[in-house]
Amino acid sequence: MEETLSIIKYKPLEGCEDQFEEELQKLYEINKDSGFADKATVKFTKLDDGSFIQIMICPTMDVLIEEQDEGLAWLDSVDHLLQKDEHGSRTEAVTGFTFNWS
């Protein structure tokens, strides 16, 4: 079993931070209703620049993949609230397997 860590950064448009935070709360409720929150650790934080970070720690990559369609549907629903980079991406994200030295 390979624990998987995924970190996603969202940058709301200026003036949309509060509305986006409300939508993140809805995402958390979606995660609870689907059972994802029972299988994974999901945390959110807000940075000083107004960006939001979502951190997910899943017991396996499969757990993360199972939730992918729901997550992308949510992301599409908040597209109008997000800044996009020069390539049109709405997020900055990294995903990988965790490891330790014990």
Predicted features along the sequence, with ranges:
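Active-site-flanking beta-strand signature of metal-NTP-handling nucleotidyl enzymes
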Residues: E3-K11, I53-I55
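An amphipathic, aromatic/His-enriched active-site/gating alpha helix that lines ligand/cofactor pockets
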Residues: K26, I30-A40, I57-E92
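Absolute protein N-terminus
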Residues: M1-E2, S102
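Short, solvent-exposed loop/turn elements at beta->coil junctions and helix N-caps
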Residues: T41-T45
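Short, low-order "capping/linker" segments at domain edges
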Residues: V94-S102
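Short, surface-exposed ligand-recognition loops at beta-strand->loop->(often short) alpha-helix junctions
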Residues: K11-E23
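Short tyrosine-centred short linear motifs in exposed loops/low-complexity segments
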Residues: M1, E14-C16, D62
